[in-house]
From Swiss-Prot:
GO terms, biological process: chlorophyll biosynthetic process; protoporphyrinogen IX biosynthetic process
Organism: Prochlorococcus marinus (strain MIT 9313)
Protein name: Oxygen-dependent coproporphyrinogen-III oxidase
Gene Ontology CC: cytoplasm
Coarse class of the protein's main subcellular location: cytoplasm
Length: 349
């Protein structure tokens, strides 16, 4: 691989900002068009906005759809002179450089409790010679179906493998680690992939838990330098994995009959989703610190949620299986006990 491919931490290639912008903007359009067809009841309302300090974005929101109770797909392209603390804490060498960030983020809250909530985010950042890619997607079911979790992970592993077979080995446990509610002692859902600060240097894990599973796997694998082009292709492959990873699950579950019990549990679990986004999510913190558009930053929150003091799922119930198994990191492909635990609760198709 020649130096022209920009392996490692060299400067970004020409037109890097334009290409990153076009990638995430294209993902927003492609995904929204497919979701409108899937919903068949509502369209996305588009709001374009400008950021006084520099840049702007485009938010697309669907409300009261046939399939999606609420969904938001946001694109932003922002720039400025002064970096926020959330970035400088991670990359102090970026201090003093004008910065640029672009990305697309999405959260869909389906109406039917048997259809999982999903989140996606892919982004690119530059500040002088400093650049990196970040992103990921994760699935939050309210009722447990083993094959849905396996399908979602399988499609994203295949996307990562197009760039390097080592990537998913780190990005899967990193996702489990990132989408973790420390105050609840549980993950937000069944995970997926998550990566950040991928600057080509070869260190795959750049999170905050140096003793966690993702960090351990990253150390065992050693450095795997990547070019800007390879990391661009990773974002492209993973972004395009969204529809084949999620649409078949929606199509399979959206017509399943449900009652008030399922709806109430869905709303209760949505409360956990809101807790994570408001307390732990770095994207929310970055947006608020940089005077982003509040409506777009908080559009990931569910339209309805509820809290119940001291709630415990009934013993040996589907709700208990969700809480005990599907909010804990799992080896979805190699753990033979998962089927044994799921089958008595109709969680195996």
């Amino acid at each position: 691989m020649g130096a022209s491919e920009n392996l490692g931490q060299g400067p970004p290639p020409p037109h890097s900002r334009k290409r990153a912008r076009e990638l995430v903007l294209g993902l927003q359009d492609e995904i929204c068009n497919e979701l409108e067809s899937l919903d068949g009841g509502q369209s996305f309302r588009t709001d374009s906005w400008e950021r006084p300090e520099g840049g702007g974005g485009r938010s697309k929101v669907m409300r009261e759809g046939r399939v999606f109770e609420q969904g938001g797909v946001n694109f932003s392209e922002v720039h400025g002179e002064e970096l926020p603390p959330s970035i400088l804490n991670q990359r102090p060498e970026a201090k003093g450089h004008p910065w640029f960030a672009t990305g697309t983020s999405m959260v869909l809250h389906p109406r039917n409790p048997y259809v999982p909530t999903i989140h996606l985010n892919y982004r690119y950042f530059e500040a002088g010679p400093v650049w990196w890619f970040g992103g990921g997607a994760d699935l939050t079911p309210f009722y447990p179906y083993l094959e849905d979790a396996r399908h979602f992970h399988r499609v994203h592993k295949q996307a990562c493998d197009t760039v390097g077979p080592e990537l998913h080995k780190v990005f899967k446990p990193w996702c489990d680690e990132y989408f973790y509610l420390k105050h609840r002692g549980e993950t937000r859902g069944v995970g997926g992939i998550f990566y950040d600060y991928q600057d080509g240097s070869g260190v795959l894990y750049k999170g905050q838990n140096s003793e966690g599973p993702a960090a351990q796997v990253s150390r065992e694998l050693g450095p795997h330098p990547k070019s800007w082009e390879q990391l661009f292709e990773l974002a492209k492959a993973c972004g395009k994995a969204f529809l084949p990873a999620y649409v078949p699950i929606v199509e399979k579950r959206q017509e399943q009959a449900y009652g008030d019990r399922e709806r109430q549990f869905q709303l209760y679990r949505r409360g956990r989703y809101a807790e994570f986004n408001l307390v732990w999510d770095r994207g929310t913190i970055f947006g608020l610190q940089t005077n982003g558009r509040t409506e777009s930053i908080l559009m990931s929150l569910p339209p309805l949620a509820r809290w119940e003091y001291g709630y415990v799922a009934p013993a040996d119930s589907r709700e208990a299986l969700l809480t005990d198994l599907f909010t804990r990191p799992q080896n979805w492909f190699e753990d033979a006990t998962l089927e044994e635990r799921c089958r008595p609760h109709q969680a195996v198709d």
